[in-house]
Design a protein with these regions (language model features):
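C-terminal His-loop and adjacent cap/lid subdomain of alpha/beta-hydrolase
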Residues: 1-275
Length: 275
């Protein structure tokens, strides 16, 4: 389920760079960069824009099948996107040896995206070597909380959801939303790839987590992390899932342990503190 946040960040970071937002006459024209970034943070659900930038740069290309030109955030303040001039692929093979979306004759060659790496789990699309896909954002209302909180206006909300679109199974952007293969979703839930709160409630959990939510907004004395992607909210999402699905309706089996000052890595005294 972490993949959902990565995919959403890729779509949102791309959408924010559209002329409808930052172009002459765009909805954010005339705003300061700080005001723009506050809107992005509210939409993303993060302390600031840096978390989505980190997801894009660290894992945003994992879903790319075959040959592609990597896109990445080149400016952590504005979110400006750059594209590599050189083709690459996730197989770590010569481009001639893998699938190339622009060359139909390579359709049968290795794809090496995150879903094809696990094709034996997901299965293939009928009549294709492509793996079935779990990604889906149909019906997602991006920025709804930001709208309700008054951080963005109705026009920004509508424009964002018109522009955000989705991706195809090769992770190419498209105007329509992403749609999952039902068989892949069934596999994800039945296999435990999507963690079951009912099952998690049956074990003792100590959730250890340091600060890795931002490289802009950081606790005093902490060096900013390079790629802030290990977010606090994941712990609470697991907790909510346990409460919702456990027989007892609570999460007494889960303890949350935090150590902000040392960043993501646990302090050296943790072993002693545990006793």
């Amino acid at each position: 389920t972490t993949t959902m946040e990565v995919g959403d960040c890729v779509l949102l970071v791309e959408a924010y760079q559209k002329p409808a937002f930052i172009g002459a006459g765009g909805l954010w024209a005339g705003l300061t960069q700080a005001q723009i970034n506050a809107r992005k943070a509210a939409i993303n659900g993060h302390p600031d824009q840096s978390a989505c930038h980190a997801w894009v740069n660290a894992f945003g290309s994992n879903g790319k099948a075959g040959v592609y030109f990597q896109r990445f955030v080149g400016n952590g303040t504005t979110g400006a996107i750059l594209q590599s001039p050189n083709p690459t692929n996730n197989c770590e093979l010569p481009s001639s040896a893998v699938y190339d979306p622009t060359r139909p004759e390579t359709f049968h060659l290795p794809r090496c995206n995150a879903w094809n790496w696990a094709v034996n789990i997901w299965g293939t699309v009928p009549g294709s070597v492509a793996a079935q896909d779990t990604r889906d954002n149909v019906g997602v209302q991006y920025g709804l909380k930001a709208l309700r909180d008054g951080v963005i206006g109705a026009e920004e909300f509508v424009t964002l959801n018109e522009l955000v679109g989705g991706i195809d199974r090769d992770s190419n952007p498209r105007a329509q939303r992403s749609t999952a293969d039902l068989g892949a979703l069934e596999t994800a839930y039945r296999s435990g790839i999507v963690a079951s709160g009912r099952q998690l409630a049956r074990m003792a959990i100590i959730d250890l987590r340091g600060w890795d939510d931002s490289n802009v907004t950081v606790p005093p004395g902490l060096n900013p992390p390079g790629a802030p992607i290990h977010h606090q909210w994941f712990s609470w999402a697991v907790r909510d899932r346990i409460v919702a699905e456990s027989a007892a309706g609570d999460a007494r089996n889960q303890a949350l342990w935090r150590f902000a000052r040392t960043g993501l890595a646990a302090p050296g005294t943790l072993g002693l503190e545990a006793f």
